[in-house]
Amino acid sequence: MSSPLIPVILSGGNGTRLWPLSREEYPKQFLKLTDSISMLQSTISRLDSLNTSSPVVICNELHRFIVAEQLRHLNKLDNNIILEPSGRNTAPAICIAALILKMKHPNENPLMLVLPADHSVKKVKTFCNTIKSAIPFAEAGNLVSFGIKPTHPETGYGYIQKGKVLSDSDIYEVSEVRTFVEKPNLKTAESFIEKDEYYWNSGMYLFSVERYLQELSLYRPDIVKVCQETVKNIHYDMDFIRLDDKIFRNCPQESIDYAVMEKTKDAVVATMDIGWNDVGAWSSLWELGKKDSSGNVITGDIVCHETENSYIYTESGLVATIGIQDLVIIHTKDSLLVSRRDSVQNVKNIVQHLDLSGRKEHKEHREVFKSWGRCDSIDSSEKYHYQVKRITVNPSENYRCNYIITVRNIGVVVMGIAKLTVAEEIKILKENESVYIPAGIKHSLKILDNTTCVNRSLDRFLSC
């Protein structure tokens, strides 16, 4: 391969249709929904058989520490996280990545493999072989989209109509693109299934940095102009690449399909059957999951009796069901969702209601993730003025309290060893040892071994 192949992972979605597990501050791409690792990690790991460079991940600034931690677990953290201060859709996001890669590879023309972070692929070998087959077309200057062989009439996806076949084998086919089709109605989708020339538009792409910038400059020079100005003012912060919000917010919002793929004369489509799913709803996870003899997909401490064809998940605590069928039941530490499987697309209406009601359950989980670890709000009472949190600090990290003058603290080490600095005094705390921290005193916590969990009781409310 003459050109470096660089995965560009789009990780900016909120996944509201998978509430209550997916939330604004911890959306579905960071969850372990279909594997023992997160969807973001799966997206990167399934490329292991390809000779790729370190991935570039584009994400919301709010999710930066989650992305960094998940990349660190894969040993893929390499100053490669681009932080979007505001979402401007896929065309500008990919443009920013292309301009940064052009800067980093001044004497090369890397290939960008653009992938959403939250898709599921069952046939990984076929997927990778199809990418390999598409590389020569991208190196020749084509813009490659990846089409999925449809398994049913689907009104939630766009379609690609293929034209003249350029290359094929038993597992893949590369063709000219005849047209892109917007999300159809059911009757039209049913007609597509009867033909062998329509494929789901997967939202995955392969092209060189230069060709994407050339085509975007041709059709949307306004986007390129703002992105160029943004990249001139990027700021490197640890493993993050920060964009100037004042500049980037002026960028028009546009998808790559509208901006480039539907207009370019050099689009080709690599079609494949890879067991693909965009995991857009709980019903998708029921379809993907391993079912018991009654057709149920269950995760967690669950007892089922006379229960059929249901998806049941519990994050904490026992869930028991009797005499139900075709339901989705999702139980988290602070919320419970019960829905018919054929109605779960409407969970977004619940999220909108929570937002309009000023609630927080659609935004954050009870347990939140920080740069230094995580914090679980176990219990609280405004009436009795206390709050109990379980704080877990990562190895070699420091936790510094955002102290408030009226707050008193009692800290208990549940597991591990910690060095606690209270004002100027240093204390070493081991398991089951506690310390009292008076109101208004600065304090910080440093971990001395691999795992430490600290339980803190507060008499006022304060953020971690």
From Swiss-Prot:
EC category: transferase
UniProt KW Disulfide bond keyword: no
Pathway participation: Nucleotide-sugar biosynthesis; GDP-alpha-D-mannose biosynthesis; GDP-alpha-D-mannose from alpha-D-mannose 1-phosphate (GTP route): step 1/1; Bacterial outer membrane biogenesis; LPS O-antigen biosynthesis
BP GO annotations: GDP-mannose biosynthetic process; O antigen biosynthetic process
EC number: 2.7.7.13
Cross-referenced CDD domains: GDP-M1P_Guanylyltransferase
Source domain of life: Bacteria
GO MF annotation: an example: mannose-1-phosphate guanylyltransferase (GTP) activity
Entries under Pfam families matching the protein: ManC_GMP_beta-helix, MannoseP_isomer, NTP_transferase
Catalytic activity: alpha-D-mannose 1-phosphate + GTP + H(+) = GDP-alpha-D-mannose + diphosphate
Gene3D superfamilies xrefs: Jelly Rolls, Spore Coat Polysaccharide Biosynthesis Protein SpsA, Chain A
The keyword Nucleotide-binding is annotated on this UniProt entry: yes
InterPro entries in UniProt: GMPP_N (IPR049577), Man1P_GuaTrfase/Man6P_Isoase (IPR006375), Man6P_isomerase-2_C (IPR001538), ManC/GMP-like_b-helix (IPR054566), Mannose-6P_isomerase_type2 (IPR051161), NTP_transferase_dom (IPR005835), Nucleotide-diphossugar_trans (IPR029044), RmlC-like_jellyroll (IPR014710)
Keywords: GTP-binding, Lipopolysaccharide biosynthesis, Nucleotide-binding, Nucleotidyltransferase, Transferase
Role: Involved in GDP-mannose biosynthesis which serves as the activated sugar nucleotide precursor for mannose residues in cell surface polysaccharides. This enzyme participates in synthesis of the LPS O7 antigen.
UniProt family annotation: Belongs to the mannose-6-phosphate isomerase type 2 family.
PANTHER family listed in its UniProt record: MANNOSE-1-PHOSPHATE GUANYLYLTRANSFERASE
The protein's name in its UniProt record: Mannose-1-phosphate guanylyltransferase
